[in-house]
């Protein structure tokens, strides 16, 4: 499941007019893209405007995800150095690791115990994220009936 914003959809039309130079698959933390290695040099070798990419990516992902959540990104670059990117839905295992990061670090023996109420609330959050990732459903009642 991929997500592309209206701004990126408009850029997609322009990028697809020319031949595609490269398609990059990246793993970037939401809202934390910067010029530091390995991302900065990776983008620099293709000659795109890195600052524009970082600003676009950080502003779009801050609204949708918690800061630092690992996101799979597909970056398309054409021969004129124009680009657009698509966000892929994070894996559910990554979402659960983000929610229970403190419990996993504090666990002894590899077993993690979570309260039932908290687990249900977090499953509800994940269900909402999955439903609204492509902005298909936003009604709480529909999500409540469908997932819980």
From Swiss-Prot:
**What GO CC terms are in its UniProt record?**
mitochondrial large ribosomal subunit
Give the InterPro entries listed for this entry: Ribosomal_uL11 (IPR000911), Ribosomal_uL11_N (IPR020784), Ribosomal_uL11_N_sf (IPR036796)
Record's subcellular location? Mitochondrion
Matching SUPFAM superfamilies, A to Z? Ribosomal L11/L12e N-terminal domain
Record's signal peptide: none
State if Cytoplasm is listed as a keyword.
no
A GO molecular-function term, please?
large ribosomal subunit rRNA binding
Give the UniProt keywords, A-Z. Answer: Mitochondrion, Ribonucleoprotein, Ribosomal protein
Which GO BP terms, alphabetically? translation
Query: PANTHER family from the entry?
Result: 60S RIBOSOMAL PROTEIN L12, LARGE RIBOSOMAL SUBUNIT PROTEIN UL11M
**Which family, according to the similarity comment?**
Belongs to the universal ribosomal protein uL11 family.
Q: What is this protein called?
A: Large ribosomal subunit protein uL11m
């Amino acid at each position: 499941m991929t997500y592309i914003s209206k701004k990126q959809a408009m850029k997609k039309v322009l990028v697809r007019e020319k031949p595609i130079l490269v398609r990059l698959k990246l793993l970037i933390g939401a809202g934390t893209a910067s010029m530091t290695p390995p991302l900065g040099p990776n983008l620099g070798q293709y000659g795109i405007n890195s600052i524009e990419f970082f600003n676009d990516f950080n502003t779009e992902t801050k609204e949708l995800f918690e800061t630092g959540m690992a996101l799979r990104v597909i970056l398309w670059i054409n021969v004129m150095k124009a680009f657009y990117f698509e966000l892929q839905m994070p894996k559910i295992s990554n979402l659960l690791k983000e929610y229970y990061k403190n419990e996993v670090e504090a666990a002894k023996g590899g077993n993690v115990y979570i309260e039932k109420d908290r687990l249900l609330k977090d499953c509800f959050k994940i269900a909402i994220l999955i439903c609204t990732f492509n902005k298909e459903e936003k009604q709480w009642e529909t999500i409540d009936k469908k997932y819980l």
